[in-house]
Amino acid sequence: MEDKSGLPELTDMSLWFKNNIKDLSKVTKIEEFPNDKRKVFDNTIYASSLNGLFSDCKLFSNQTVDSIISKINIKYLSDKNAFINTFSGLEIVTKLNLTVWDFSNLEIKNMKNMFYGCKNLKELKGIKNLVNSKTVDINTMFADCSSLEEIDISDWDTSGVEDFSRMFDGCFNLKKITGVIDMKSCKQYAGMFGVNQGTGCKNLKGLKIKNPPNGFFLSGLDKTQYEII
């Protein structure tokens, strides 16, 4: 089904499960999308926003999340805040694979808290081109992902990001970040790799940063853990 503009019918999936299921505290899986009466697009939903999509979905399993992701098409995301808190409610998920989503032509400005609190997440794939020159806020994006060991951001363009605050705060087991973090437009970065040594990325090595702001200092790392290129 398409409207007169030639676009498919779009669905705002902000807080989708929280708004459609009375009590999420014991829900472990979803058989069908709640209240989706249309059942069109061959079980595909074209989303306009994913803001808070998995909010409060603490017991959703890897399999449940993978199934939901496979049914969502993000080609027409129009909300510039579409990725705020998208996965932040997932507490037991150990793997996320977003390769079915193509981020290359999106212009999402705000990704604050996108994966915040995914404390059992060990493996994250399919985030190529997630952050681009239009992205402004990645505050707390991976904060408290305490099981995450490595991440590949080699295809990211962070040159337009203004807020890096607490981006990796609480990522105790993070060992490797593949790629370079460009802080050309940075205005805020407090606690980027930990508010202090106690919440810092103590196992991280070989971090590469370019264009740091004046007076650059990372509270959660020591200078042997990163280099300015």
Segments the model singles out, each with a brief description of its role:
Residues 1-229:
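Negatively charged
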